[in-house]
Amino acid sequence: MSDGTQKLWGGRFTGETDPLMHLYNASLPYDYKMYKADLEGTKVYTAGLQKLGLLTDAELAKIHEGLAEIQKEWDADKFVRHPNDEDIHTANERRLGEIIGREIAGKVHTGRSRNDQVVTDLRIYCRDVVNDTLFPALKGLVDVLIKRAEGEIDILMPGYTHLQRAQPIRWSHWLSSYATYFTEDYKRLGQILHRLNQSPLGAGALAGHPYGIDREFLAEGLGFNSVIGNSLVAVSDRDFIVELMFWGTLFMNHISRFAEDLIIYCTAEFGFIQLSDAYSTGSSLMPQKKNADSLELLRGKSGRVFGDLTGFLMSLKGIPSTYDKDMQEDKEPLFDCLTTVEHSMLIATGVISTLTVNKDKMEAALTMDMLATDLADYLVRKGVPFRETHHISGECVATAENLGLSGIDKLTLEQYQKIDSRFAEDLFETFNFEQSVERRNATGGTAKSAVLKQLNNLKSQLN
């Protein structure tokens, strides 16, 4: 039993640990984040020991009182750490002995290893972060995108491919596109949650529990869906961390592209949007500058999260079966990933909820050449094969350019009919941006009805 000078594993050692090795080995500076999960796991585990007859009712009550006292200290930031507190498990067990006495506290770890203890803590911690932090923050982001899309449904803007103006779309269609990405992230996170919510507790160091503890009882008490059926896998599996961090990298890839679009849209060259002061910074030299640092950081921090994942994968890839100390390197990148993702969600929500849209600039950026596909579709409706109409429309664009005209709508009917005799007076009805977007009314399109349908569908998926 640790008393602040002894280690949990110190019985077979006679020499002192090198001071640098102690610091190198210690994880309490970061794994303290799991204090609540560690205490919760110990509370249920000791109930399992009592069920086996290894603890009396009185001992269990005393242990639970002590655990509650420790949680109060952590919650109030009054827990006193000792130099030899190697990790959160050591610290909590040491403190429990101080509160209720070492004799009773010394029974808490009966049949349990830190190998199954730490991964139990990790799974509880990840589950709580997903449920209490990531789900609400991500839903909040999608809700803001949907609300904005509904309120600004009538604003038109250029849609881009290759960062070149392509076809007119609704601003709400762009908003809906990222609401769709983030809703898929939301659903994907739910699938990961189902897989990570399995209990390793009771697997021991690697070979199983020596006293036949009821692992299903432990799992139920901790809110897990099931137990992991192989004790070797139970203590060594970190796939749930890899999956969660991969999810974080995928979300950050989406948020990075989202940020890049908005960075472009808020430049003076585009002027489609203006960020609020709350999410902008200035220059230390140039007084006129208003920089989109919030968006640039969203883009930049995506690389940080990618690095968290790849770094841990490199630590994990070559280790032998069951537990190895390399696995201690799972926590810092995991915690960093989860915190960065959460903060990115909140920043993105703040940005999109407070920015100002310049409707006039968006609509002024629409040009008639963006209706060249509509011109091709005009002939398709007259029975001309699309491949032929595509060529004809391209010839119309080239003719207007060669004549120095500002757009294909400036060609006369006579000039159109020189290119193809099937053009008629009604072709000029094609040159209307509102009608262009309204023709895209199939599911997923940019017509008002299609966008509203997308938004309603997204709401139902989140609910």
UniProtKB/Swiss-Prot annotation:
| Cellular component per GO, a single term | cytosol
Q: Which keywords label this protein?
A: Amino-acid biosynthesis, Arginine biosynthesis, Lyase
Q: Which Pfam families match?
A: ASL_C2, Lyase_1
Which residues does UniProt mark as catalytic?
162 (proton acceptor), 283 (proton donor)
Biological process (GO) annotations held by this record are: arginine biosynthetic process via ornithine; L-arginine biosynthetic process
Q: Which SUPFAM superfamilies does the record cross-reference, listed alphabetically?
A: L-aspartase-like
Highest taxon listed in the record's lineage = Eukaryota
Q: Which CDD domains match?
A: Argininosuccinate_lyase (cd01359)
Where does the record place the site Increases basicity of active site His? 296
Give the enzyme's EC designation.
Answer: 4.3.2.1
Please provide, alphabetically and separated by semicolons, the GO molecular function terms listed in this UniProt record.
argininosuccinate lyase activity
Recorded catalytic activity of this chain's protein: 2-(N(omega)-L-arginino)succinate = fumarate + L-arginine
Q: Does the keyword Lyase apply?
A: yes
Task: Give the pathway listed in the UniProt entry for this protein.
Answer: Amino-acid biosynthesis; L-arginine biosynthesis; L-arginine from L-ornithine and carbamoyl phosphate: step 3/3
Q: Does the keyword ATP-binding apply?
A: no
UniProt binding sites for 2-(N(omega)-L-arginino)succinate: 27, 115, 161, 291, 323, 328, 331
What family is it from? Belongs to the lyase 1 family. Argininosuccinate lyase subfamily.
Xref: NCBIfam families = argH (TIGR00838)
Describe the protein's quaternary organization and the partners it interacts with.
Homotetramer.
Identify this protein by name.
Argininosuccinate lyase
Provide the species name.
Answer: Saccharomyces paradoxus
Q: Which classification does the entry list for the species?
A: Eukaryota, Fungi, Dikarya, Ascomycota, Saccharomycotina
What's the gene?
ARG4
